[in-house]
């Protein structure tokens, strides 16, 4: 990602129980982003939330753990790469039976640096 170009942030709102061919949808999205060369993706697990087709507001109580929680995947990259990735992602989302929301907005990237790869212990 070049910080001199216009950047965008894509947010994908799904549920932790959403699947694509028996795999968690959030994993599929992150692997697709990596495979397509996007700068990075982060998955956030929400504490509480609901969507347009929700019957309940999902939240854990003191004595239980709820399997179904809201998830947000954030991907930041150049505007052109984000738009191209949306076109790759859209067919996957049209196939699934569950709901989904995607937002996109301009992002001002203040700093972006790739980390150095760790040296293997045996290559010292």
What are the residue ranges of the model-derived segments?
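Positively charged, small/polar-rich N-terminal and surface patches that mediate targeting and assembly
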Residues: 1-124
